[in-house]
Amino acid sequence: MNRRFFILATIGAGTALALLPQNSKTHIDIAPFKVIEAVQQTLFPKNLKAPCASQFGATNYLLLVSSHSSFVKSDLKFLKYGADLLINYKNDFLTMNSKDRDEALRDFVDSSSKAENWVALLLFYTLEALLSDPIYGGNRNELGWRWLNHNTGQPQPKLKFAQIE
């Protein structure tokens, strides 16, 4: 791992952790989210016409929503499991350049149905981060909406999560 990548990963993880609700911070294992962040950056890299994952806050979104009680716990468990599966498949994935990461991710998806399902689930949540209301922690600066030229419906949410009684 080079120094620049380490610093960027640490800043990204620290920022994401700081955005979590105070009572959920003790229950978050940040290691899988470093892998998830790298995969999201591979799926939505810089230099495309679409916003890149770091620009629209894909990992921050997933950290925020997965810490809420309404998040499907089996999804969180599978997301963490898949991150471990990927690192076991390619232990140098986090230190690869973007081209090698893309190739490794394609090989990983082809290696098993679990790997394919994991990437599909992660893509689902990444697209949700791109297109959801910014109040939920993704779609930073409405980048996803602006990219698609989308006009939002009204009224927009005022609270992050509905109050369940």
Where are each of the predicted segments found?
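N-terminal secretory signal peptides and thylakoid transit peptides that target proteins
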Residues: 1-12
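Bacterial Sec-dependent signal peptides at the C-terminal "C-region" and cleavage site
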Residues: 17-29
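Mature-region segments of soluble proteins
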Residues: 34, 38-41, 50, 57-165
